[in-house]
Amino acid sequence: MTLRTLYQTLLDSDMARLHVIAQQWDITVVAERKPDVAAELADAMAHAEAVERVLADLDDAARAALDDLLRHNGALPWAIFIRRWGELRAVGPGRLEREELWREPVSAVERLWYLGLVQRAFATWAGGQVEMAFVPEELSLYMPVAVPLDVVPPKPAPPPAQQIAGTDVLADDLVTLFAALQMETLNPAAANEKTAWMRLPQASALLETLALEQGWLQRDERDALRPVAEPMLAWLQVDGWSQWAALARAWMESARWNDLAAVPTLHPDPVREWPVDPRAARQAFLDLVRHCAPDTWYALVEFIAFVREQNMDVLRPDGDYDVWALRDAATDRPLRGIEAWDVVEGAWIAFVLTGPLFWLGMVDLDNEPVTCFRLSAAGAALLELGAPPALPEPPPLRLSEDGVIGVPLRRRYARFQVRRIAQPLTWDEDYRYRLTPTSLTLARQQRIPVTRILAFLAEATGQALPAHLRSAIESVYQGRETARLEQVWLLRVPDPAVLEHPALRRFIRESLGEGMALIHAADRAKVVAVLARNGILPETDIR
């Protein structure tokens, strides 16, 4: 990382420090003016032999601190550097010369500082201006490449007795979202499917954010979500693994979705809200997850400790734990300083593992309460640690003789098409829909030809369409009157004249004969009230 030149950094130093550096490098300075002294020093220091001689005199701690900088391209935020390698005392030039403090440095940082091997300057880092510790490039050119540190992976845990496999059902929820948004413009009741038909309702906010970011959805002039046909269909028509991977990678690369803002135990900083680069933090975290072996279980607490050991600044790359403070969701207490690491960073790590990574099927978990996890085959593949899992081909659609369509999981394009022509019934192991006059009328409003419906059903089921269903579908499309099955109540009264009462007559759907009438199920309570006001307490037979 190129910051300031060696000469510029020396020019910013006071004369006392320049004399200390010259003395320790065994450089005789002739000049008296600071610019000239800085120039002489920079000239004499930037030589291989001079750098090699100074490095040979470093103690182990100072060499380790210098190597730490070199492993990070020669620069680290000053706050992180001094936290790792010790303080630099704030002293004036008089005390420095009088007490000769460089002879007994209190830390590795102080040793490197008075040698001039480490300098300080502000630079753009993690989206802001941050004070950096760095090795001037004129010196680092002559330094050996630091040996990479071996990362000790997290300690494995025993397999739990109960395991919950991460799967690709979030992709099925995306189809539910597409279908509901597509249909609600014709039938507002379809909006209920966005909650009632979600297998992972807790992931709905993530799903909407990713779909918008990927261009599968957009907001219309009324700010309502609407599918974007071409990219949506492109996703629907690829194979199951490609759909799964596209959704997972959308999260991995997302700049809009902020995992920290979704942690339920945290509230935002009152001023800075959620001052974290969500994508950069996620990428740094996933780099640590890559140290987990596939198909190996790890305790959450052990992995959180591993993150703290390897990259505790994963959320705060500037190393500053005081510049912003989230709030405890329960008490509104400010969570400031490194002492709050477990309740901020620790909570974020646990949420990402048990939330998005699990929702996307990248990890498996144990049962509630969650205490451990492992990378799934899909997670290993997405993190480039293994091959993609082999997904079995889902069976064809099933069409019963009464017009109920069963759609297996992963038949996503077919399910989107089915929802355009059929009403949703229920879901568990698969999704079930029913062909009805209302659903087929809506299909006609979408200008779906009846021939296309018949061909689709035959192709998707792999069987010839039963003649009676073909006839029923064609009958609706031709506008013929059809049967209707309704939920009604039968009202019996001893005096037929009661049914002629104006307050009651408006609720009668159909008269059946002497003292009997049908009323709509939704009007039952109103009819009971009318009868009571007229001196009749009805008996209701509910079985």
State the predicted function of each range.
Residues 1-338, 343, 351, 359-360, ...:
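Type-3 copper protein
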Residues 162-171, 237-543:
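Extended alpha-helical interface modules used as scaffolds for assembling large macromolecular complexes
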